[in-house]
């Protein structure tokens, strides 16, 4: 495996119900990312913004496009927070934003991002696709394809895809492998339909796992632990 993209939800950066950012959690994520980076694998990241603002369910009476732009700005804050933690470990990283903010971070340039990774730097993609009405999951799959990644991994609070919500149904069963068509036809909410369609059309495998420990990213890269894979028709 040469190059991978890890999607991290904004909620994962926060202590549950306590704060917008949890320094211990962010440090744990950074150490886990460094561990994979030290394997010689090129790593890029997409960060969500749901711990700060979620466009689809934010302030009432704000139109969807404006809310989505607010969510994109939230992802930039999260990207800078994670960049600081990664750099503090002695690993060089760069933030690239789909919405240019030149005094804060680099604008997104595909070839420059690839060049950074080839120079052993971690690249953090912020501001989603730069367009409203597209989720950060869609941005993650899009960047995975653009970067020529071998796989897109989505780190969540649940260790894979289940037949039902495992938090409310103790009999829910984890599904280890699904096709893109399965996810679309069953309307599974693990990824939005745009993200699944892009992955399917470009043959990008997607792995869903729980990013609950420093070792989680490392383990799933080495095909250890619990996870679900989406690939194949």
Swiss-Prot record:
Reactions catalysed according to its record: UMP + ATP = UDP + ADP
Origin species: Neorickettsia sennetsu (strain ATCC VR-367 / Miyayama) (Ehrlichia sennetsu)
Annotated metabolic or biological route of this protein: Pyrimidine metabolism; CTP biosynthesis via de novo pathway; UDP from UMP (UMPK route): step 1/1
Description of how the protein assembles with itself and partners: Homohexamer.
Pfam family, one: AA_kinase
Protein's name according to its UniProt entry: Uridylate kinase
Activity modulation: Inhibited by UTP.
Places the protein is found: Cytoplasm
């Amino acid at each position: 495996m040469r190059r991978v993209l890890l999607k991290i939800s904004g909620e994962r950066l926060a202590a549950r119900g306590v704060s917008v950012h949890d320094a211990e959690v962010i440090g744990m994520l950074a150490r886990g990312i460094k561990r994979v980076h030290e394997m010689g694998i090129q790593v890029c990241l997409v960060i969500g913004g749901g711990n700060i603002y979620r466009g689809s369910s934010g302030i009432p009476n704000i139109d969807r496009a404006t809310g989505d732009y607010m969510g994109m700005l939230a992802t930039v804050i999260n990207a800078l927070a994670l960049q600081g933690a990664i750099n503090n470990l002695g690993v060089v990283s760069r933030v690239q934003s789909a919405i240019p903010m030149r005094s804060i971070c680099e604008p997104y340039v595909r070839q420059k991002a690839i060049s950074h990774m080839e120079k052993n730097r971690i690249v953090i993609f912020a501001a989603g696709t730069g367009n409203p009405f597209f989720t950060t999951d869609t941005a993650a799959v899009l960047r995975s394809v653009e970067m020529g990644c071998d796989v897109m991994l989505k780190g969540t609070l649940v260790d894979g895809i289940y037949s039902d919500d495992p938090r409310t149904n103790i009999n829910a069963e984890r599904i280890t492998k699904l096709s893109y068509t399965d996810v679309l036809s069953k309307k599974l909410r693990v990824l939005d339909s745009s993200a699944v369609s892009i992955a399917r059309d470009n043959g990008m495998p997607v792995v869903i796992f729980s990013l609950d420990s420093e070792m989680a990213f490392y383990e799933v890269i080495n095909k250890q632990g619990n996870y679900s894979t989406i690939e194949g028709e």
